[in-house]
Amino acid sequence: MSPGLEVADLGTILSIWAHPDDETFLAGGVMSMARDRGQRVVCVSATAGEHGTDDPVTWPPERLGAVRRDESAAAMRVLGVEEHRWLGFEDGTLAGVDRSVGVARVTELLDEVAPDTVLTFAADGMTFHPDHMTIHTWVREACAGARLLCAAVEAGFLERQRDVLEAWGVYMSEERPAGVPTGELALHLVLDDPVLDRKLAALQAMPSQVEPSLAVLTPDQFRTVNRQESFVSV
């Protein structure tokens, strides 16, 4: 399962992301496995993802933000995560927030939760989304003492799924993430079917975000691209 760490090694987990659904796509399996073991998991969303639509007339920010909060609550129930915090920043604006403000909010969470492990984005934000990349900056600056694990893509998986990921349209830049060799990953999970099924059920609890993906990918492709969760130690 893992060349280094196992989920049991992670202790109390603070999982910090930009938008509701980031955590489920990138760490839903880790979080649900930890909860199954009785570990404390606190999930944090910096924004409500209220601008995450190509149709703002049908989905104005107030409406979409409320829907995404409700969807996120449903997804957290599926994963067994009972503690979910919202930082209340506006979606799409994190890069313009004074860095000291963002770092201070993360520091408050670290002081409150006292996690053994923090999960978040790597510097590339996985998709080069500016909000994702900003969260990495805040968390890395604030994080001291706890183990910091940043979401990555295993090199072999990236090579096999490159065309699918391009078709999915997840990248927000001409840049692409570099695959990480398995032996360099701190935590590498290939989710077994029960865990993957739970993760997919959590994703399906967020139809405002997942239905566009399922319009592009086949069910088998969507299942495959969500089976692995990988992290590097920073």
Which ranges hold each PLM region?
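Metal-dependent de-N-acetylase/amidase catalytic core
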Residues: M1-L14, G92, G96-V234
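Active-site rim/loop-helix segments in enzyme catalytic domains that contact anionic ligands
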Residues: M1-A114, E141, V232
